[in-house]
Regions:
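Conserved beta-strand/loop scaffold segments within soluble protein domains that form the structured core
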Residues: 20, 105, 109-390, 394-397, ...
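N-terminal amphipathic, basic helical "cap/leader" segment at the start of enzyme domains
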Residues: 1-140, 144-145, 295, 323, ...
Length: 472
């Protein structure tokens, strides 16, 4: 296959992708439709957010659609740092995919965890069914359409009925090459009453010093059948030259539950969309999002909840801190339809600004079509509290140390709610290193022993923002 840039991603290139992978005609047609929509759709579909859409400097045009093969030394170095015996892991290192060793006991239960290409080849009819009933349609989002057209990596996970898996399923992506694009699509099927955890980790081993812009595009769908319970934790610590486009969406059947948690810490420009659709009665969703921007980083995040069935519940909280010249835009919408009687929803968006050149905006929204529901939302953007700063400095701390403690205290009530301990530890570590101006891949993976002891002791935190809301 010839090496192409994103501006050359045309119908011929899509045909080349499909032909090289021996894909069925319906998937090729789906890719072509998606590519056509990408060229036509605006960056922002909602009139509420159109004026905030800002893609200046994204530089997608020069992105190469050819991922290099990593060297053996690079592969071994990554594996030595990221290998874990406490998870079932797929590694995506540049263009190289390393599949997991699934324990025999789980394999006999019918669990499937493999890369998306292998899954499509083995069971094309299954994928035809889900692609024709996709959660994230090409027409829903410009960059979702681009992913649907160009994806070449990703994972497929199926957990059968009534199976509870204690080991997490882990997907680790490492993107180091300059000017390259990696497009991953993930499909998760949680059958009736299944329960499991997914860890999605994005890293660059060289966090600074690169100039050529790279692109990471990830699209994840979680289909929850009756009574299914899924935890999906993700962390983004990609390099300062990577543009990140992330779309995640779940469809929840009766009494299902999903818990999202995201640490958005890396990248040059990050555009993140998380949506939970509670389609049937009793479905529930929780979404926790932590953002820390420094330098010239830009973050544009969305947390949406669509409650269609009665007696559903949704809870989404996002917190972000920006320093230097960083920018943060946090958006979210609660939609409760006319049939969603007795439903409950809460949406909170809070930003903290450090410095005169940083900027943050929070835009929560409500669309409610019925009575007998409870929907609350809160939003705040502020500088560091001068009284808190003065108090800490009067106790002997420097201004820098005092601000660091205030930031830790701002984030911790939310980080403490991240359901996967290893992810929570890594988020804390990266926040601390970013505050100190240290950008070292190996250091990000290590947690000082005293921090482990402190949090394992179960110190309680209180979120002072939880009481501030608008009520309906």
């Amino acid at each position: 296959m010839s090496e192409l840039t994103l501006t050359q991603a045309n119908e011929q290139y899509v045909h080349e992708i499909s032909a090289s992978r021996h894909e069925p005609q319906w998937l090729r047609d789906f890719r072509l439709k998606s590519l056509n929509l990408f060229s036509k759709l605006p960056a922002e579909l909602s009139y509420l957010y159109t004026k905030y859409a800002d893609l200046a400097g994204i530089e997608l045009k020069s992105t190469s659609l050819h991922l290099p093969e990593p060297s053996q030394a690079q592969t071994q170095d990554v594996l030595s740092k990221l290998r874990s015996d406490r998870a079932i892991t797929i590694y995506q290192i540049e263009s190289k995919t390393i599949l997991p060793d699934i324990p025999d006991a789980l394999r006999k239960e019918g669990i499937i965890f493999t890369d998306i290409r292998t899954a499509i080849e083995h069971d094309p009819e299954l994928f035809r069914r889900y692609f024709l009933e996709k959660a994230i349609l090409p027409e829903d989002d410009k960059f979702g359409a681009l992913n649907n057209a160009l994806f070449t990596t990703g994972f497929y996970l199926y957990v059968p009925k009534s199976i509870e898996v204690t080991l997490p399923f882990r997907h680790v992506t490492v993107l180091d090459s300059e000017g390259s694009g990696l497009f991953a699509q993930n499909l998760v099927i949680a059958d009736n009453r299944s329960k499991f955890t997914i860890l999605e980790e994005l890293y660059s081993t060289r966090l600074t010093g690169q100039t050529g812009r790279s692109t990471y595009s990830g699209l994840s769908e979680v289909h929850l059948r009756e009574g299914a319970d899924v935890t999906y934790a993700s962390i983004n610590n990609l390099a300062s030259n990577v543009n990140v486009f992330s779309n995640k969406k779940s469809i929840g059947a009766r009494d299902s539950r999903i818990e999202w948690s995201s640490g958005l810490l890396g990248g040059a420009y990050t555009r993140s969309r998380v949506e939970s659709v509670m389609k049937e009665e009793g479905a529930s969703s929780e979404n926790v999002e932590v953002v820390f921007g420094a330098g010239t980083q830009r973050f544009d995040t969305v947390s949406n909840m669509s409650q269609i069935g009665p007696n559903t519940s949704g809870h989404a909280v996002s917190k972000g801190v920006v320093k230097d010249k960083a920018r943060l835009l946090v958006k979210g919408m609660i939609r409760i339809t006319k049939n969603a009687k007795n439903s409950r929803a809460y949406l909170a968006e809070h930003g903290m600004i450090l410095g005169k050149e940083a900027r943050a905006d929070a835009i929560p929204g409500l669309e409610i079509e019925t009575n007998e529901v409870k929907a609350t939302h809160s939003a705040s953007v502020a500088q560091v509290n001068d009284e808190q700063l003065f108090y800490l400095m009067s106790r002997g701390l420097s201004e820098d140390e005092a601000k660091r403690l205030i930031i830790v205290g701002f984030f911790e009530p939310l980080v403490a709610r991240v359901p996967v301990a290893d992810v929570a530890k890594r988020i804390r570590r990266i926040i601390d290193l970013k505050w100190s101006g240290v950008y070292d891949f190996a250091a990000c993976l290590k947690t000082p022993a005293f921090e482990d002891e402190y949090y394992e002791e179960g110190h309680k935190t209180q979120d002072i923002f939880e009481g501030h809301y608008k009520y309906r």
